Amino acid sequence: MSPSRPGFSCSWLPYLLVLPQLAITAIFFLWPAGEALWYSVQTLDPFGLSSEFVGLSNFIQLFQDEYYLASFYTTLIFSALVAGIGLIVSLFLAAMVNYVLRGSRLYQTLLILPYAVAPAVAAVLWIFLFDPGLGLITHALAKLGYSWNHAQNSGQAMFLVVLASVWKQISYNFLFFLAALQSIPKSLVEAAAIDGAGPVRRFFNLVLPLISPVSFFLLVVNLVYAFFDTFPVIDAATGGGPVQATTTLIYKIYREGFAGLDLSSSAAQSVILMLLVIGLTVIQFRFVERKVRYQ
């Protein structure tokens, strides 16, 4: 006879317990999302005092704007680089710490420190290092015959914001990867080694499948981070330049809505960005998750 499941003495208590979370979701997500959807089909004056229904006109104008399409492409490239490089570097560092016995605590502490730095501060730190006139890295590159000026070179500007964004997120990824690696039974790794599997083969055939749930979770988190949370890095490092080379969708929304006071266009861009992130998340859960092995 199976034991009975513990229940609540009052039928309304479960609903009361989830009410705060539902209220937060409604106030900070559903309400703003609903307003953005409504404003996206309106044309508003700069102060939002008068409006006129225009249907899909705002969306049509966006997809006819070459600068918006360029920011769309920039966002995809930027997000892929931040998520891909961040996950690979973090996994490599976690694997190194996991196999190092001496000084592993020191390595963990040093690798966790960047997570305590605000994104804007992280961008400023890298700006000082890559400053065309005073930066230490810039002077080192100059001695090698390479000229650096991210304010004029779009490729260098993209490299700078990707580097700062990846550096800021490495600590978060590192903690999860290290915990996942340390949870793998050593007996499995030792058995694979006895069977003749080398370090590389053990990693790809044994370790990587076992940590795939964590890898999948971090893939989703890093893509969302690249889409939204890198705004302070871009704003502080390049301001979206040069020539909008580092203007992502989230930064263009800010520029249109807060700097240009084009509320209708920024609302339409917000809706498109929301649908894009939802679509990418659905694709990941439908196709990528199939290769994830849950224990």
Swiss-Prot record:
One of its GO terms (cellular component) is plasma membrane. GO terms for biological process: transmembrane transport. PROSITE patterns: ABC_TM1 (PS50928). The chain crosses the membrane at residues 12-32, 81-101, 110-130, 158-178, 208-228, 263-283. It is a multi-pass membrane protein. It is found in: Cell inner membrane. Residues 72-284 form the ABC transmembrane type-1 domain. Residues 1-11, 102-109, 179-207, 284-295 are cytoplasmic. It comes from the Bacteria. Signal peptide: none annotated. Keywords: Cell inner membrane, Cell membrane, Membrane, Transmembrane, Transmembrane helix, Transport. Residues 33-80, 131-157, 229-262 are periplasmic. The keyword Zinc does not apply. Its main location: membrane. The complex is composed of two ATP-binding proteins (UgpC), two transmembrane proteins (UgpA and UgpE) and a solute-binding protein (UgpB). Belongs to the binding-protein-dependent transport system permease family. UgpAE subfamily. NCBIfam families: PRK10561.1. Part of the ABC transporter complex UgpBAEC involved in sn-glycerol-3-phosphate (G3P) import. Probably responsible for the translocation of the substrate across the membrane. This is sn-glycerol-3-phosphate transport system permease protein UgpA. It comes from Yersinia pestis. The gene is ugpA.
